[in-house]
Amino acid sequence: ETYSGILCDIGSHQIEQFLYYSGCDNARGVNSQVGNYCHSQYPEMEDFGEVSLVGENGASNYFRVDWLTPDGLSTWGDGRTFILGTKGYIELRKYVDVARDQTKDHVYWVDEKGEHREDVSGKVGYPFFQELLHDCIDRTETAMTQEHALKAGELCVIAQISAQKIK
C-alpha cells in the first residue's frame, strides 16, 4: 500500500493554519524532512516529519508532525500550536493540557501585561467544520477560498516531494 506521506497527511493542516494565522496567500519551503523511526516493517511508512516555511510577508513557520504518541498520553496526539509574535506569543493546547488538566481546549498567552491562561472548552465551538461542509454542498467559500485550500495543498506536496529522508 502507498500513501501521500506524513507531510501531506497531517502536515497539510499545519500549512493551512500557518497561511491563515499569518495572513499569507503564499509561502516558500525552506526545509523539509521525513523519517521512519518505529515502523521498520513498513519501509515506505513515515512516522515523523518536519517543515520550515517562510510566508510572503516574512512570517516564518516550523512544524513537526508524527505518529509517535506515547501510550501514557490520555488522548491520541498532542495537537499543540505555538504562535510567536514580536510582542508576545500564544500556545494552543487543543486536545490535552499535558500532566495538568484532563480537559481540552486551553489557550496560553504571554504579552506585555503578563502570563495568561484560559480554558475555552465548550466556549468556542467548531464553526470551521460546519462552514466547510456547507462550502462543499453549496459551492461557497465561507470556511476558506478554493485558492487558499489549493495553495495549502500545493505547499504540502512540494514539502513532501522535496523532503530529505533522515531515517
Model-inferred region functions:
Residues 51-53:
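Short beta-strand scaffold segments in enzyme catalytic cores
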